[in-house]
Amino acid sequence: MTLALWVLFATVLMPIVCAGIAKVGGGGDTYDNASPRDWLARRTGYQARANSAQANSWEALGCYLAGLGAAYLGGVETALIATLALSFLIARVAYVICYVSNLATLRSLCWIAGFGCCLTLVALGALGS
């Protein structure tokens, strides 16, 4: 499996990890598996931010898939795809850490970096380089 596909594997797991972080703690309010979305909607602090990071991670997954598909279909060199994929993963991990830690400006910069990697993959695929 290529590095870019391992990054895809990690990217698929990121929303699940974020959901787990959102469900840890709670100050005595135990997780309600019968109504998980309502329970998560009442979270505050790091739990609410982790839940938001989960939602954004699902969105980023689609963006990465589009970029990866375009790059492979466009015949982009595997090494370049791998570099952009790894950069995307680093940006996304940093994004989640910043989101949960309430570092909003740094989080936005990480989001821009990750999105930029996806856009670059799509553009390179479209150019056929």
Model-derived segments and spans:
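Hydrophobic residues within alpha-helical transmembrane segments
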Residues: 10-13, 86-90, 109, 116
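Juxtamembrane boundary at the C-terminal end of a transmembrane helix
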Residues: 78, 121-129
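Interfacial loop-to-transmembrane junctions
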Residues: 93-116
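Structural signature of hydrophobic alpha-helical transmembrane segments
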Residues: 78-88
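Core segments of transmembrane alpha-helices
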Residues: 14, 55-68
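Transmembrane helix-loop junctions in multipass membrane proteins, especially transporters and channels
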Residues: 23-31, 75-76, 104, 127
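Long, highly hydrophobic alpha-helical transmembrane signal-anchor segments
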Residues: 1-21
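Cytosolic, membrane-interface loops and tails of multi-pass inner-membrane proteins
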Residues: 24-51
